[in-house]
Regions:
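Predominantly extracytoplasmic/ectodomain segments of secreted and cell-surface proteins
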Residues: 10-128
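Extracellular carbohydrate recognition and processing domains
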Residues: 295-342, 363
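Residues within well-ordered beta-strands of beta-sheet-rich folds
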Residues: 136, 256-262, 287-289, 328-334, ...
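Extracellular-facing segments of soluble proteins and assemblies that are Gly/Ser/Thr-biased and enriched
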Residues: 206-296
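Extracellular carbohydrate-recognition regions
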Residues: 129-174
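Extracellular carbohydrate recognition
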Residues: 341-344, 354-377
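Single conserved hydrophobic/aromatic residue that forms the stacking wall/gate
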Residues: 1-12
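Short carbohydrate-recognition loop motifs
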Residues: 190-210
Length: 378
């Protein structure tokens, strides 16, 4: 078949010159692909409302979630402008940016996109996981409702303790031939803290033993602090358990109590009769109890706080070994009944340097330090 010149010309390649203009950053192939949120914190120095965040922020790399707790007193309007400070992988960027206020109120979530140096992106979802109460034991006052003229009795604001019982021994002990001029068992520690300037110090003290008008005075008064109320005169009827009313009204479902503690058991352990018990070791007790009530006046005391059929959930930790440096503790409440938000509850957190101190069994000098306690609610 013959071909014309036109066919030949059609089949000849035609050279072209193409010019490409690059914009942006040219990648070398060695750029980092890491796109992580390394730190996500709330600093009250950055924004006052950030002080509503309590405890540690949890960054879960597997689920790519960021969760944190807020104070149980936090109102929704205050949670609309929390300001996280964010640190990401080197040369990565994050959107929304660090230091920008975000709305975490009413269950809202905020999605953060981290872009690596090479353009790889990873998303994290941040949200409030629950609310909590935080106690740093920095707030103390001094005095007594029983004896207003006494100005040296430590009061742990927001908590009850056994100091009034020791004050009563100081004021009335002479009537039973008892003289006690030592320290109060519950007082602030300023030279041994986990954080801040103060911690809660509980030290079981030697109150000599005996009786005042027939009311027993223990050889050792165990140091105890708790959420609830303490009535030193309750023991005048002969029942030391009647001094404690454990728990405060609580409209949330507590899940666990965390914090830090140190412990030194005393060397000499005495029973309720004031007899030295050779070879018996004291132990500290840290506990939490949620129980149902029919009214605000109903309460559990030292005789039934761990045994009542009113108990809905509890956690108890004891230790008879020395803990020389602050160690974390975690009281996970075990529920024996279903929680019902329509019912009334009281919640008690109890710290004691001597676990059986309510029965007057304790060691002189047993010392428990507590700091930075958080009650975490559902």
């Amino acid at each position: 078949m013959s071909r014309g010149l036109g066919d030949v010309y059609k089949r000849q390649p035609v050279p072209y010159t193409v010019k490409v203009a690059y914009s942006g950053t040219k990648l070398s192939g060695t750029e980092s692909s890491e796109a992580k949120i390394l730190s996500f914190v709330f600093d009250k120095e950055v924004a006052a409302v950030d002080s509503l965040v309590v405890g540690d922020v949890v960054i879960n790399e597997e689920s790519k979630t960021i969760t944190f707790m807020v104070a149980d007193t936090a109102k929704a309007e205050y949670l609309t402008a929390l300001v996280p400070t964010i640190e990401v992988s080197e040369k990565a960027t994050v959107t929304p940016a660090s230091g920008v206020a975000q709305d975490f109120s009413n269950g809202k979530t905020v999605t953060y996109t981290v872009t690596a140096e090479n353009g790889t992106t990873v998303e994290y979802v941040a949200s409030i996981s629950g609310n909590a109460s935080f106690y740093d034991f920095e707030s103390w006052s001094y005095g007594s409702t029983m004896y207003p003229e006494e100005q040296d009795c430590p009061i742990l604001n927001g908590w009850a303790c056994c100091n009034d019982a020791v004050l009563l021994i100081k004021k009335m002990g002479a009537l039973g031939g008892i003289t006690y001029e030592g320290e109060y068992p519950v007082r602030p520690s300023t030279d041994d803290v986990h954080a801040g300037e103060k911690a809660l110090l509980l030290e079981s003290v030697d109150t000599k033993g005996g009786n005042i008008f027939g009311t027993p005075v223990p050889k050792v008064t165990a140091a105890t602090a708790f959420l609830g109320t303490f009535n030193a005169f309750g023991a005048l009827g002969g029942d030391p358990m009647a001094t404690t009313s454990f728990g405060v009204m609580y409209d949330k479902q507590p899940l666990k109590v965390t914090g830090f503690y140190k412990y030194t058991p005393g060397a000499e352990f005495y029973n309720a009769n004031g007899e030295l018990q050779a070879g018996v070791a004291d132990k500290c007790s840290l506990s939490a109890v949620l129980y149902e009530v029919s009214s605000e006046d109903e309460t559990l005391n030292g005789g039934n706080i761990y045994t009542s059929d009113k108990i809905v959930a509890k956690a108890v930790f004891t230790n008879d070994k020395a803990v020389e440096s602050y160690a974390p503790f975690e009281l996970n409440l075990e529920y024996v009944k279903d929680y019902d938000s329509s019912k009334l509850y009281k919640f008690a957190v109890i710290f004691s340097a001597s676990a059986d101190g309510a029965s007057y069994n304790a060691a002189v000098g047993s010392k428990l330090l507590i700091d930075d306690v958080t009650i975490i609610n559902k």
